């Protein structure tokens, strides 16, 4: 997602990668008007319409949707990844840059190390180290994927960087879509 608050625009991108090579198979973007105010914890309502438009524009459905945000690891236990998964029926996971409000112990320094992301005693996700000695990402289930598989998919999508390739490529596409948007919106 990328926002242009001056023009009241939001851009979303969907990127489908080959699971074995991480080569781009398909990509699509959508640009729309911001139709929901910024409310912490309710970003899904602000982002979902444009995300759905980007997913609908893909020539092939993704086998897994990796959201730059949360699923179960959300104060309401229903973040963007959960919301999107329920609406589309697609398997979804959330991979966030920050832990939101949840407690966690730092995972060990090697790539692949994890630590539980806790809401009280409930494990709502995992802090996952995707690079040796680099700040972890925060993985949570969204829809139709277990936590261990969500972590395994995240590691497969992070061979060289902290963030999943899907997120990195989608971020670049969103920024480009906003630059090219001019007055055209979906």
Language-model region placement:
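Two-metal-ion RNase H-like nuclease active-site motif
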Residues: 1-4
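A glycine-rich, hydrophobic loop/mini-helix early in the fold
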Residues: 6-61
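Flexible, glycine/proline-enriched loop segments at strand-loop-helix junctions
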Residues: 38-42, 67-75, 134-141
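C-terminal binding/interaction regions
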Residues: 48, 97-98, 106-186
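Feature detects long, helix-prone N-terminal segments enriched in hydrophobes
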Residues: 65, 101, 105-106
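Short hydrophobic alpha-helical runs that function as membrane-insertion/retention elements
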Residues: 91-96
């Amino acid at each position: 997602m990328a926002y242009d608050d001056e023009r009241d625009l939001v851009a979303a991108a969907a990127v489908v990668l080959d699971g074995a090579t991480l080569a781009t198979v398909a990509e699509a973007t959508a640009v729309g008007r911001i139709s929901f105010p910024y409310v912490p914890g309710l970003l899904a309502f602000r982002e979902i319409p444009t995300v759905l438009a980007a997913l609908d524009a893909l020539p092939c459905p993704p086998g897994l949707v990796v959201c730059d945000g949360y699923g179960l690891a959300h104060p309401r236990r229903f973040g963007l990844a959960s919301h999107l998964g329920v609406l589309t029926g697609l398997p979804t996971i959330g991979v966030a840059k920050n832990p939101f409000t949840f407690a966690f112990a730092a995972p060990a320094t090697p790539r692949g190390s994890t630590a539980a992301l806790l809401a009280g005693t409930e494990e709502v996700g995992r802090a996952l180290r995707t690079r040796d000695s680099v700040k972890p990402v925060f993985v949570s289930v969204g829809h139709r994927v277990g936590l261990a598989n969500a972590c395994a998919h995240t590691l497969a999508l992070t061979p060289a960087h902290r963030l999943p390739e899907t997120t990195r490529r989608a971020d670049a596409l969103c920024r480009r879509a906003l630059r090219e948007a001019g007055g055209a919106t979906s």
